[in-house]
């Protein structure tokens, strides 16, 4: 049987797609592929990607009308949070440690809450 093997892309609506893509490229080191498009390591990259569904009334994405949230797998959560703090990025003070990794949350310039995940080694 044919099956999906991962998430091929993440698509968000934005008031200014070029500026928002540039922000993600700058803050998270994601390669800019063109105006409004970013690529991680390329199609040969491996790693776990989660495709999850939350109840409509879940507060996990933060308050407000946000209907989706990106989870970015990061290599050094503390260092990245330091960089983001220095860049003036809005950061949620909450942290979560789980058996499968550490989590933190930030907001992009358009108010989307973004989850950062450093997998457990």
Q: What feature does the model see in each segment?
A:
Residues 63-84:
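Mid-chain, well-packed structural core segment of small domains
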Residues 24, 51-55, 115:
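Active-site-proximal beta-strand elements of phosphoester/diester hydrolases
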Residues 1-12, 81-121:
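Vicinal oxygen chelate
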Residues 45-63:
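Aromatic- and Gly/Pro-rich amphipathic surface segment
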């Amino acid at each position: 049987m044919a099956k999906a093997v991962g998430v091929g892309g993440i698509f968000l609506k934005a008031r200014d797609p070029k500026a928002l893509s540039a922000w993600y490229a700058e803050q998270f080191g994601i390669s800019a592929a063109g105006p409004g498009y970013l690529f991680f390591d390329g199609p040969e990259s491996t790693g776990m990607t989660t495709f999850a569904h939350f109840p409509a009334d879940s507060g996990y994405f933060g308050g407000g009308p946000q209907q989706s949230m990106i989870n970015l797998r990061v290599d050094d959560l503390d260092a990245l949070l330091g960089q983001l703090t220095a860049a003036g990025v809005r950061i949620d003070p909450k942290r979560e440690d789980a058996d499968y990794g550490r989590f933190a949350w930030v907001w992009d310039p358009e108010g989307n809450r973004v989850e950062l995940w450093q997998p457990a080694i």
